[in-house]
Amino acid sequence: MKLLVVGSGGREHAIAKKLLASKGVDQVFVAPGNDGMTLDGLDLVNIVVSEHSRLIAFAKENEISWAFIGPDDALAAGIVDDFNSAGLRAFGPTKAAAELEWSKDFAKEIMVKYNVPTAAYGTFSDFEKAKAYIEEQGAPIVVKADGLALGKGVVVAETVEQAVEAAQEMLLDNKFGDSGARVVIEEFLDGEEFSLFAFVNGDKFYIMPTAQDHKRAFDGDKGPNTGGMGAYAPVPHLPQSVVDTAVETIVRPVLEGMVAEGRPYLGVLYVGLILTADGPKVIEFNSRFGDPETQIILPRLTSDFAQNIDDIMMGIEPYITWQNDGVTLGVVVASEGYPLDYEKGVPLPEKTDGDIITYYAGAKFAENSELLLSNGGRVYMLVTTEDSVKAGQDKIYTQLAQQDTTGLFYRNDIGNKAIKE
């Protein structure tokens, strides 16, 4: 069986590597991928994510059994609909189902309609009305661009002035283009955040281990928001009862609601949750695997990944098993300056061997050379599975200390929250 993974980052590297390790899978193509993936025997296809017709033509020519769609913008642009219209299978939600991610206002409407716990909110396209709402509610308060903004469209404002400025940047200054033409303004929720992922087909879903991401650029959760600087799974200090509550009060009603709305969901659903004094509440939905969480969740899967996905798509009950001991922890290495301006072309250390997996996010071969250079904001991620968070930290940070990371940076405190508890 030949498979296609659409996307280019560390998430897609982890998905493609796991698929290639499955029985019955002979070849995995990644479009467009990045050069670091070739070190794991993956085949790159020079077609960008937005070129749906070229991807479909490639899939037909190469007798691809099905495609796994990685990035949010492809799903929001209807790539799954296009594959299905061409008679091809793709694992991911249709454009209508993916609206859970590409419109925060739509997600809020679904949650309100199906009684799913989330923050109180208002949606505005008029700046003066948004400003009046902010002044009425007070701070802290959260301002979100309605559409996709590369994970950077959320401002947690400590003051009313900050919130008004964020709303102005989105609504008047066009900071995120059409994505910020509407804003969702939410009450600030206090508590610890965690991620819950599920494989989904309609109202059938299969929960994955919990994960905790680290969004801020620098140690101590300082600095700007990023796509994510590291993660670990499972979250050892999170009681199973909280997960069970989240499944019954959030995941199940949302998926049943989507079926009732005529938008049945197929693919991976990410639920960003916060554990408040009133129990778990939804911060956001993503209509696909998270990055970097994929890179620490998939190494824990002990069943046949390709078979699992194939079964889920066919409506067959999958046999999914997970490693149930130890902790998988990963640290992202990014270009200095990320998530703002950064340089490309920094030489990268050699790929790790043994127990530490290297997933590449932004890597490119130097011309006529096997030397990998940085080619993005997040560059690579080191991942290991150990008995504890502490043991995972020791392993990864010892390895990083031995690598030449000139021109790159990483956080030194990934997993600390689990140790403090």
From Swiss-Prot:
Recorded hits in InterPro entries, A to Z, give: ATP-grasp, ATP_grasp_subdomain_1, PreATP-grasp_dom_sf, PRibGlycinamid_synth_ATP-grasp, PRibGlycinamide_synth, PRibGlycinamide_synth_C-dom, PRibGlycinamide_synth_C_sf, PRibGlycinamide_synth_CS
Native source organism of the sequence: Streptococcus pyogenes serotype M6 (strain ATCC BAA-946 / MGAS10394)
Signal peptide start and end residues: none
Q: Spell out the molecular function terms from Gene Ontology.
A: ATP binding; metal ion binding; phosphoribosylamine-glycine ligase activity
Tell me the residue numbers annotated for binding ATP. Answer: 134-195
Q: What is its EC number?
A: 6.3.4.13
| Catalytic reaction equation(s) | 5-phospho-beta-D-ribosylamine + glycine + ATP = N(1)-(5-phospho-beta-D-ribosyl)glycinamide + ADP + phosphate + H(+)
Domain of life, per the record? Bacteria
Pathway(s) served: Purine metabolism; IMP biosynthesis via de novo pathway; N(1)-(5-phospho-D-ribosyl)glycinamide from 5-phospho-alpha-D-ribose 1-diphosphate: step 2/2
Keyword annotations of the record: ATP-binding, Ligase, Magnesium, Manganese, Metal-binding, Nucleotide-binding, Purine biosynthesis
Q: Which cofactor does it need?
A: Mg(2+); Mn(2+)
Q: Alphabetically, which GO biological process terms does the record hold?
A: 'de novo' IMP biosynthetic process; purine nucleobase biosynthetic process
> By its UniProt entry, which NCBIfam families does this protein fall under?
purD
User: Would you identify the family this protein belongs to, as annotated?
Assistant: Belongs to the GARS family.
Q: What is this protein called?
A: Phosphoribosylamine--glycine ligase
Q: What does the note accompanying the cofactor annotation read?
A: Binds 1 Mg(2+) or Mn(2+) ion per subunit.
UniProt-listed HAMAP family:
GARS
